[in-house]
Curated annotation (Swiss-Prot):
Organism the protein comes from: Arabidopsis thaliana
Record's protein name: Protein ABIL3
Reported impact of residue 135 to N: In strain: cv. Ita-0
Cystines in this chain: none
Disordered as annotated region, ranges: 179-273, 279-298
Gene field: ABIL3
Main localization of the protein described in the UniProt heading: cytoplasm
């Protein structure tokens, strides 16, 4: 127990190496004391045994032995606790050192990786400035079988390609022009404008009904004279013919005659739809202005028609009027 009591006090260390060396020496001394504790206990037991045999005051020897055994046990437990604490402290310190070393290594690796990425980026930027990138243009193939004629427009097959120089571009432009010349667009029909001298003399807007009045009655029943210059073509459907039915054979005094407007050489020809609309507007008259004789004949023809016959007789009758 004298070795444990005479343990030297650690001196203040100046740097990290001295501190680690001092701690390692203290740990080794603690292990030596723990190893010598067994020999000390055995020597104390032999001493008390001899004293108890040779000494007459055995009661005093027994009391002294009890006190020594208690102190020796307490010192042993204390010594084991201190050694255990030192071992744990040493292990924790080494673990912390390892963790700190790993952290520093990871930081160094991260810095190296960032430096490498920066160097690669700078190298790529420098190479991009040095390298002359080629310019690509569009190339068009114009096979004669795939061109669809549609006026001045043609459907082209677009294929991405590259032109090596200005000569290729000139050849391509000449080929396109030659192809366009080979496939001329279909001719567009233009309206032929005739001079006023070549046109036929137009009829005047005034009408004379003396010839109609002096004509025989049969001819008047067959066909009514149309006051318009361009009469409409008749068809077989009944839905289109009501305008022709409402037209009377003889003009009434209350009905105003709408003359056909004159056309000049510079005026474009009107379409058929415009002419039909104009004639329909001119033919809109109230039904009460029709002559009673014609309505009677129409009613008589409808009543005298047989049921077995078809509507051809009615259509022919309506076509006459």
């Amino acid at each position: 127990m004298s070795a444990a009591a005479t343990m030297p006090m650690p001196r203040e260390a100046s740097n990290y190496d001295e501190i680690s060396m001092q701690q390692s020496m203290l740990f080794s001394d603690s292990l030596k004391d723990l190893k010598n504790l067994r020999t000390q206990l055995y020597s104390a037991a032999e001493y008390f045994e001899l004293s108890y045999t040779n000494d007459e005051q055995k009661q005093i020897v027994v009391e002294t032995l009890k006190d020594y055994a208690i102190k020796a046990l307490v010192n042993t437990v204390d010594h084991l606790g201190s050694v255990t604490y030192k071992v744990n402290d040493f292990v924790d310190e080494k673990v912390d050192e390892v963790a700190g070393t790993e952290l520093r290594v990871s930081c160094i690796e991260q810095r190296l990786r960032m430096c490498q990425e920066y160097m690669d980026h700078e190298g790529r930027s420098q190479q991009s400035l040095v390298i002359d990138t080629p310019k690509f243009h569009k190339r068009y193939f114009l096979p004669s079988g795939e061109i669809k004629r549609g006026g001045n427009l043609a459907k082209l097959k677009n294929v991405e390609g590259s032109f090596d120089g200005e000569d290729d571009w000139n050849q391509f432009r000449n080929a396109v022009r030659a192809t366009i010349r080979e496939t001329p667009p279909p001719p567009v029909r233009k309206p032929i404008l005739q001079s006023p001298s070549q046109r036929k003399p137009q009829r005047s807007a005034t009408f004379s009904f003396s010839s109609i009045a002096t004509a025989p009655k049969k001819e008047q029943d067959k066909r009514a004279v149309s006051p318009h210059r361009f009469p409409l073509l008749r068809s077989g459907s009944v839905a289109i013919r009501p305008s022709s039915i409402s037209r009377p054979t003889t003009p009434s005094k209350s009905r105003a005659v709408t003359p056909t407007p004159k056309r000049y050489p510079s005026e474009p020809r009107r379409s058929a739809s415009v002419r039909v609309a104009f004639e329909k507007e001119a033919q809109k008259e109230p039904e009460h202005q029709q002559q009673p004789s014609k309505s009677k004949r129409l009613l008589k023809a409808l009543l005298s028609r047989r049921k077995t016959k078809k509507d051809d007789t009615l259509y022919t009758y309506l076509d006459e009027y």
